[in-house]
């Protein structure tokens, strides 16, 4: 073999050029190392990602802030599911606030911020993903108790509702623990003449095995185990709804199912690409063309994964009737405050009190249902 041999301890990233081994003749086992340039992938990422991240940041921040404001104005109407959805909105807000940094990094082709910022932003993404999956698991279990275990629902949920804040704190804590490897291994370092913010495992023995181990643990606890819980819960939920033929129950669960499906549709493609990338680590016979394809796919699916941050508020607005009503009330109240007084003569305060009174009356009709999913 001519040329330099590949170091199997290196953990390749799809944005870096590397050497591939190709046969020099059909009958010869000799091969030579050729440089696989991923400049096309980097150029595509430099143009596509900043625009996509900017749009996701604007719409995600606006939508999730409105969700938090809506919950804040109508906090008496919360159920356990509402508390989980509120925490998911907070996680999404924290996440989209990091996107401008990544947009700048892709646009400039280098990580221009500090090493501490690199670790922090990478960690926030991992925590957001794991927290979202665990909260969706909690939502699924809450809906399972409310619908499948209807006879026990009131007793169980009435005991658990006051503890919803503790449950959310546990979820956040587990998310931090699951994502701890992200804070440890991600760092700013120089490669091919520019600084990057990527995982670096060269400080440990057998870095490829370490990367596979960390990736496996994150996927296991942050994706596959929650997914199994959701499949179990929603299988019995759908079975119960089909048997009940209750349109009101169908409306109550519709928004939750939509949120789960959208989240999985956004996250599964990118995680499958990461699995393929991990499976290719250390292989000598990696095709340059296939690596370019993986690079393009990773860029697009990553944007798709981030897109869920601004899709959840849209789902609430178009599917959740009570959320839509509450949101419209807030808009009317804000408009009323701006105008101070309507031509009819009654004040904004009176109108707001009327809205609150109506909201409280509506909530009393169904204390056990999620106010944002009916």
Swiss-Prot record:
<feature type="transmembrane region" description="Helical; Name=5">
    <location>
        <begin position="212"/>
        <end position="238"/>
    </location>
</feature>
<dbReference type="GO" id="GO:0004950">
    <property type="term" value="F:chemokine receptor activity"/>
</dbReference>
<dbReference type="GO" id="GO:0007165">
    <property type="term" value="P:signal transduction"/>
</dbReference>
<dbReference type="GO" id="GO:0002523">
    <property type="term" value="P:leukocyte migration involved in inflammatory response"/>
</dbReference>
<keyword id="KW-0812">Transmembrane</keyword>
<dbReference type="GO" id="GO:0072676">
    <property type="term" value="P:lymphocyte migration"/>
</dbReference>
<feature type="glycosylation site" description="N-linked (GlcNAc...) asparagine">
    <location>
        <position position="23"/>
    </location>
</feature>
<dbReference type="InterPro" id="IPR000355">
    <property type="entry name" value="Chemokine_rcpt"/>
</dbReference>
<feature type="glycosylation site" description="N-linked (GlcNAc...) asparagine">
    <location>
        <position position="7"/>
    </location>
</feature>
<keyword id="KW-1133">Transmembrane helix</keyword>
<keyword id="KW-1003">Cell membrane</keyword>
<dbReference type="GO" id="GO:1904155">
    <property type="term" value="P:DN2 thymocyte differentiation"/>
</dbReference>
<dbReference type="GO" id="GO:0036126">
    <property type="term" value="C:sperm flagellum"/>
</dbReference>
<protein>
    <recommendedName>
        <fullName>C-C chemokine receptor type 6</fullName>
    </recommendedName>
</protein>
<dbReference type="GO" id="GO:0048290">
    <property type="term" value="P:isotype switching to IgA isotypes"/>
</dbReference>
<feature type="transmembrane region" description="Helical; Name=3">
    <location>
        <begin position="120"/>
        <end position="141"/>
    </location>
</feature>
<dbReference type="GO" id="GO:2000404">
    <property type="term" value="P:regulation of T cell migration"/>
</dbReference>
<feature type="topological domain" description="Extracellular">
    <location>
        <begin position="105"/>
        <end position="119"/>
    </location>
</feature>
<comment type="similarity">
    <text>Belongs to the G-protein coupled receptor 1 family.</text>
</comment>
<dbReference type="GO" id="GO:0006955">
    <property type="term" value="P:immune response"/>
</dbReference>
<dbReference type="InterPro" id="IPR000276">
    <property type="entry name" value="GPCR_Rhodpsn"/>
</dbReference>
<dbReference type="GO" id="GO:0006968">
    <property type="term" value="P:cellular defense response"/>
</dbReference>
<feature type="disulfide bond">
    <location>
        <begin position="118"/>
        <end position="197"/>
    </location>
</feature>
<feature type="topological domain" description="Cytoplasmic">
    <location>
        <begin position="142"/>
        <end position="159"/>
    </location>
</feature>
<dbReference type="GO" id="GO:0019722">
    <property type="term" value="P:calcium-mediated signaling"/>
</dbReference>
<dbReference type="InterPro" id="IPR050119">
    <property type="entry name" value="CCR1-9-like"/>
</dbReference>
<dbReference type="GO" id="GO:0002407">
    <property type="term" value="P:dendritic cell chemotaxis"/>
</dbReference>
<keyword id="KW-0675">Receptor</keyword>
<keyword id="KW-0472">Membrane</keyword>
<comment type="function">
    <text>Receptor for the C-C type chemokine CCL20. Binds to CCL20 and subsequently transduces a signal by increasing the intracellular calcium ion levels. Although CCL20 is its major ligand it can also act as a receptor for non-chemokine ligands such as beta-defensins. Binds to defensin DEFB1 leading to increase in intracellular calcium ions and cAMP levels. Its binding to DEFB1 is essential for the function of DEFB1 in regulating sperm motility and bactericidal activity. Binds to defensins DEFB4 and DEFB4A/B and mediates their chemotactic effects.</text>
</comment>
<feature type="transmembrane region" description="Helical; Name=4">
    <location>
        <begin position="160"/>
        <end position="180"/>
    </location>
</feature>
<dbReference type="GO" id="GO:0016493">
    <property type="term" value="F:C-C chemokine receptor activity"/>
</dbReference>
<feature type="topological domain" description="Extracellular">
    <location>
        <begin position="280"/>
        <end position="303"/>
    </location>
</feature>
<dbReference type="InterPro" id="IPR017452">
    <property type="entry name" value="GPCR_Rhodpsn_7TM"/>
</dbReference>
<keyword id="KW-0325">Glycoprotein</keyword>
<keyword id="KW-0807">Transducer</keyword>
<dbReference type="GO" id="GO:0097228">
    <property type="term" value="C:sperm principal piece"/>
</dbReference>
<dbReference type="GO" id="GO:0038023">
    <property type="term" value="F:signaling receptor activity"/>
</dbReference>
<dbReference type="GO" id="GO:0009986">
    <property type="term" value="C:cell surface"/>
</dbReference>
<feature type="transmembrane region" description="Helical; Name=1">
    <location>
        <begin position="48"/>
        <end position="74"/>
    </location>
</feature>
<dbReference type="Pfam" id="PF00001">
    <property type="entry name" value="7tm_1"/>
</dbReference>
<dbReference type="GO" id="GO:0007204">
    <property type="term" value="P:positive regulation of cytosolic calcium ion concentration"/>
</dbReference>
């Amino acid at each position: 073999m001519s040329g330099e041999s590949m170091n199997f301890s290196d953990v390749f990233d799809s944005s870096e050029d590397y050497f591939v081994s190709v046969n020099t003749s059909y009958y010869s086992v000799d091969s030579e190392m050729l440089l696989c340039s991923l400049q096309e992938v980097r150029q595509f990422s430099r143009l596509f990602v900043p625009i996509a991240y900017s749009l996701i940041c604007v719409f995600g921040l606006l939508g999730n802030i409105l969700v938090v404001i809506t919950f804040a104005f109508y906090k008496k109407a919360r159920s356990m599911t509402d508390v989980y959805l509120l925490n998911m909105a907070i996680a999404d807000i924290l996440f989209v606030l990091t996107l401008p940094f990544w947009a700048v990094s892709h646009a400039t082709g280098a990580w221009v911020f500090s090493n501490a910022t690199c670790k922090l932003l990478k960690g926030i993404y991992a925590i957001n993903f794991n927290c979202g999956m665990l909260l969706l698991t909690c939502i699924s279990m809450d809906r399972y108790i409310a619908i499948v275990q209807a006879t026990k629902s009131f007793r169980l949920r009435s005991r658990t509702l006051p503890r919803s804040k503790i449950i959310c704190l546990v979820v956040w804590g587990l998310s931090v623990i699951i994502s701890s490897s992200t804070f440890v291994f991600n760092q700013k370092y120089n490669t091919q003449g520019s600084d990057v913010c990527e995982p670096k495992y060269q400080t440990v023995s057998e870095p490829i095995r370490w990367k596979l181990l960390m990736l496996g643990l994150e996927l296991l606890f942050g994706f596959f185990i929650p997914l199994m819980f959701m499949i179990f819960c929603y299988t019995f939920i759908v079975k119960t709804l089909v048997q009940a033929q209750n349109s009101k129950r169908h409306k109550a669960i519709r928004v939750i199912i939509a949120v789960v499906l959208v989240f999985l549709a956004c996250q599964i493609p990118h995680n499958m690409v990461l699995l393929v990338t991990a499976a290719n680590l250390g292989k000598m016979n990696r095709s340059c063309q296939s690596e370019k394809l993986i690079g393009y796919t990773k860029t697009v699916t990553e944007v798709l994964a981030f897109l869920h941050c601004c899709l959840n508020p849209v789902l609430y607005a178009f599917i959740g009737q009570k959320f839509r009503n509450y949101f419209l009330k807030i808009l009317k109240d804000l408009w009323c405050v701006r105008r101070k007084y309507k031509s009819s003569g009654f004040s904004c305060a009176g109108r707001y009190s009327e809205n609150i009174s109506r909201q409280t009356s509506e909530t009393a009709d169904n204390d056990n249902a999620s106010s944002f999913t009916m």
